[in-house]
């Protein structure tokens, strides 16, 4: 626990120093004179090597890594069609199984084991983390210099919460998060057609992506119906939206449509608990791993409806493109904090979205929210990985972080 606390302290001091001595003065001077792509290339390379080394030397979360290694071998050896019929635990939709098939093939070809195997299994998530940082750089580059844009990207590339998630834990939240970021980026750029396919891929990788459905609906309302509406535009968007659904069906075919439907329904119904190690409202109340009742199930839905209603209010109140990123972060973080059946890592996409909101409209509140959500996610994932696995009864309640984060979100 001391190591976790020291990492938080160091990260907070580093973030404060970066803001005070670089970002804030650079924003005030608003200088955009350098044009050197080597900045982002160097930062991305260092972040990639760091993640790869950490991924190789530390196995990760025992249960999750065992699942990914086992699934990669099973899907490669048995094929897509038999995977969901095997007598083994599997709670992921088919999207990531395509990735694990390639991982399994490489593992069999080269006979990787131990550190090399750990790094290989974590590699897709690591690559997606780096690409998310590059996307943040791309968005920032529209307004700022290469140097400052790289600093913004580095706030994500070297974020301790993102490093722990993919490199140490071995989870794949960064994979579907990349497609969430791309979906919302395309919506903010009024490129709705691309966003439909990004959303389809998100859903195909992780059903938690359904949380972001309101963002896609907001984009359709604003970019298809409100701005320059025409029958041709509507039909074009409808056609590509249907095409995205057809893509999902085609990708599901090798696994068997009925198997995929069963997998989604089983996954959505799994973990019927108030919270699963999440540092949220239910965790702060001491309800970790407590089973759902009819009453708490209704309360969870009430919270979810309230969150969506609040996101509608915030979205249509805002007047700039950063609202897409901010409302996406709001949906992710508020759902994680208030809804039931939430896991420790479910607020992960909020970090990248808040950073994109900040670089789009450099409001200091966005930076503070990014720091608080990072603090919450790092504490949660690091605690589960390094403390909880060894002492499951030692549950840490993060009420101060929860309260501070909720106040700033609600005061928006």
Set out the residue ranges of the language-model regions:
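Transmembrane-helix motifs of polytopic, lipid-linked glycan transferases
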Residues: 18-22, 119-143, 305-315
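Short helix- or helix-capping micro-motifs
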Residues: 47, 152-158, 199, 203
């Amino acid at each position: 626990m001391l190591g976790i606390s020291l990492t938080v302290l160091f990260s907070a001091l580093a973030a404060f120093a970066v803001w005070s001595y670089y970002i804030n003065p650079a924003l005030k001077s608003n200088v955009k004179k350098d044009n050197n792509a080597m900045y982002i290339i160097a930062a991305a390379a260092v972040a990639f090597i760091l993640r790869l080394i950490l991924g190789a030397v530390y196995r990760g979360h025992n249960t999750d890594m065992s699942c990914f290694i086992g699934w990669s071998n099973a899907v490669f050896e048995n094929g897509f069609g038999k995977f969901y019929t095997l007598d083994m635990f599997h709670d992921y939709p088919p999207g990531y199984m395509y990735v694990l098939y390639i991982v399994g093939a490489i593992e069999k070809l080269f006979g990787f084991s131990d550190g090399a195997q750990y790094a290989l299994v974590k590699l897709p998530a690591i690559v997606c983390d780096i690409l998310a940082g590059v996307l943040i750089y791309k968005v920032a580059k529209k307004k700022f210099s290469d140097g400052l844009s790289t600093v913004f990207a580095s706030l994500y590339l070297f974020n301790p919460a993102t490093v722990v998630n993919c490199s140490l834990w071995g989870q794949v939240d960064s994979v579907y998060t990349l497609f969430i970021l791309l979906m919302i980026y395309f919506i903010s750029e009024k490129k709705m057609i691309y966003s439909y396919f990004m959303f389809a891929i998100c859903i195909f990788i992780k059903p938690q992506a359904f949380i972001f459905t309101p963002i896609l609906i907001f984009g359709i309302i604003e970019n298809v119906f409100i701005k320059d509406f025409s029958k041709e535009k509507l039909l074009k968007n409808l056609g590509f939206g249907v095409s995205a659904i057809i893509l999902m069906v085609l990708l599901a075919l090798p696994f068997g449509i009925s198997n995929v439907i069963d997998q989604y329904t089983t996954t959505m119904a799994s973990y019927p608990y108030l919270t699963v190690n999440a540092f949220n409202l239910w965790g702060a109340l001491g309800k970790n791993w407590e089973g759902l009742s009819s009453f708490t199930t209704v309360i969870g839905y009430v919270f979810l409806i309230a969150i969506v209603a609040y996101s509608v209010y915030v979205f249509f109140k805002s007047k700039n493109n950063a609202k897409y990123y901010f409302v996406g972060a709001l949906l992710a973080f508020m759902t994680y904090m208030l809804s039931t059946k939430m896991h420790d890592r479910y607020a992960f996409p909020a970090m990248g979205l808040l950073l994109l909101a900040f670089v789009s409209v450099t409001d200091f509140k966005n930076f503070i929210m990014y720091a608080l959500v990072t603090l919450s996610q790092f504490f949660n994932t690091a605690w589960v990985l390094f403390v909880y696995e060894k002492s499951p009864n030692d549950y840490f309640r993060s009420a101060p972080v929860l309260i501070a984060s909720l106040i700033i979100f609600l005061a928006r």
